[in-house]
Amino acid sequence: MQPASLEETPSLLWGLDPIFLAFAKLYIKDILELKESQQVPGIFFYRGHPIKQVDVLGTVVFVREKENFYSYGVDDSTGVISCTCWKSTAPTEVSSPGTSARHVSSSSKDLDVMMRELYKEESKKAKLDIGDTIRVRGSIKVFRDQREIVASVFYKVEDPKLDIQMARMFDLPYMYRNVYDKPFAIPEHLKDSSAGQTDHHIVTQSHLIMLLSEKVKVFLMENKIHNFYQRELESVDSLIAIASRPVSDFKTIESMESSNSKQIRSIFKEAIQLLLKEGYIFQKDQNREVYQVTDQDKDLHKLTLNIIKEDCRRQKHAEKGCHFLHILTCVRLSVGSSVSEAVLRRVIDTLEGNSDIVSTMENYYTAF
């Protein structure tokens, strides 16, 4: 585990760490103990490395079958974690039932047969028993305060001579020693110059905006703020200290005092615009001066969930679920056009992370 004192890396810099977009091969014990990000739900940290997806190999120790998925307990000898593995949907037949036999070509019939056979084989491989070896790659989720893996890929490992498991035993210590246990270091030119650097250090305006937006995120998260005015943020000393730092490309005007106050307002405004673009906050049409914090707006989450539940009962959406753009249109009809795609993506990710909804395919969602 990373030390408790290790400061969380700003989310805008996570992409600099190659582990972020990779499937991290971690011990299950470490996955269960990862510290969750305060900035973005569903992201975890190991020694400063942002972890989104993991790759585990272990023995199936329990099996629970539901209508749409299997839940496998996977044990790698360091711990046990539940893995949600979705069942494949039945293939749609190439030839429609109402088509007369003389109009159906032999190649179409053959394709129907092949698709059915492939589906049967895939269904067989998805069903594992206790004692089988399984490999799972997927995202870490938290459901009912229990950490689990929602699989994007999973399969039974045929390893009678234990070659694959032995290779894994040698591979993981090497990865830990040379990659995971080496803390992620932010490049010097991107570090917060307020930590250990002199006050007269000049930064660019774009860097200051990015830095302030990250600090605002942390401030909103730690204080569980639901909504705010810009002027309220401008009264927070820790945020003012960042926004008032000297900027190399900010145009000076008549006096230093007026220049500094104008810079602070401008930096705050741009930082808020960045948060709006990311979907971290949004505005309701009724009051454009108030900013709503997306993660704290329970009404928006409830509205989105109800839209998906209600529409998935209709025949049109019963099979595949609701498309993202359809959900967005319905939400905008209720809340207003100010709800951006980025805001809804954040809400959808939270609902999916809580297992309130599931993705049936790319950009399609359904609710239980």
Swiss-Prot record:
Gene3D superfamilies in the record: CST, Suppressor of Cdc13 homolog, complex subunit STN1, N-terminal domain (1.10.10.980), Nucleic acid-binding proteins (2.40.50.140), Winged helix-like DNA-binding domain superfamily/Winged helix DNA-binding domain (1.10.10.10)
Keyword DNA-binding listed: yes
Winged helix-turn-helix (wHTH) 1: annotated segments: 193-295
DNA-binding region (UniProt annotation): 54-157
SUPFAM superfamilies in the record: Nucleic acid-binding proteins, Winged helix' DNA-binding domain
Keyword Nucleus: yes
Keyword field: Chromosome, DNA-binding, Nucleus, Telomere
One GO CC term on file: CST complex
GO biological process: telomere capping; telomere maintenance; telomere maintenance via telomere lengthening
Stretches for region Winged helix-turn-helix (wHTH) 2: 296-368
Signal peptide positions (record): none
Disulfide feature: none
Any one GO MF annotation of this record: single-stranded telomeric DNA binding
InterPro entries xrefs: CST_STN1_C, CST_Stn1_wHTH1_sf, NA-bd_OB-fold, RFA2-like, Stn1, Stn1_N, WH-like_DNA-bd_sf, WH_DNA-bd_sf
Family the UniProt entry places it in: Belongs to the CTC1 family.
Summary of the function given for this chain in its UniProt record: Component of the CST complex proposed to act as a specialized replication factor promoting DNA replication under conditions of replication stress or natural replication barriers such as the telomere duplex. The CST complex binds single-stranded DNA with high affinity in a sequence-independent manner, while isolated subunits bind DNA with low affinity by themselves. Initially the CST complex has been proposed to protect telomeres from DNA degradation. However, the CST complex has been shown to be involved in several aspects of telomere replication.
Subunit structure, as described in the record: Component of the CST complex.
Protein name as catalogued: CST complex subunit STN1
Species whose genome carries this gene: Xenopus tropicalis (Western clawed frog)
